[in-house]
Amino acid sequence: MTKPRKPVQGIGINDMPIGYSTGPEKPVYDQWVNVLYRAGGGEDGAFYKKKPTYVGTTVCEDWITLSNFVAWVKSHESWQGKRIDKDILCPGNKHYSPETCVLVSTRLNNLLTDSAAKRGEYPKGVDRPNKTFRARILMHGKKKTLGRKFNTQKEAHRAYCKAKEEYIREWAENLTDADTCDIERTREALLRHAVIEGNAWRETEDSADSVPTLFG
């Protein structure tokens, strides 16, 4: 008699053949486990303590069963080498499901990452290496410093948001199958994110100082 498998992350049902988790499609299995981990918070909620922005994260009932998750991933022609993203299509989304998630490249997945814990007390894209503030953006895998030094964090943040809007629009205009498994939905979503960044810097445009652009 086959011994029942222990639920993965306390809720997941691994109904795939023995050895699937260590075979050629191990990356798919690992992503499934990661989704369950984020939805459950790990042992004693350790993950949520480390990354509180994930508190309240959920996963759809279908994806609790591994074979369903695998079927969704492999229903996309260019799924290999991509990872699941829950934030691009729906800003602020905390639910993993076919309707709210998309498979994207690691570079695109990192485009909208907000490392609040790393930046500390300052807004996105802003740090203070000395008495003045600095605006920086991760572009094409490298950190780019934007323009001059800034006297206030508001000015630096405005410069970052303007540059981010331009960069997101550049991404949206040049998407390929290598970036996402759903070009149209991803493009529409990126343009929505660009609007959000644009609104952020326009709201503080009352300053007399000019804001450096990313491409000109």
Where are these regions (language model features)?
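Extended, polar beta-sheet/loop recognition surfaces of beta-rich domains
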Residues: 4, 9-11, 108, 116-118, ...
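Short, cationic Gly/His-enriched loop motifs
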Residues: 19, 23-24, 31-42, 46-138
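Structured segments of extracytoplasmic/periplasmic soluble domains
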Residues: 38, 72, 163-166, 170
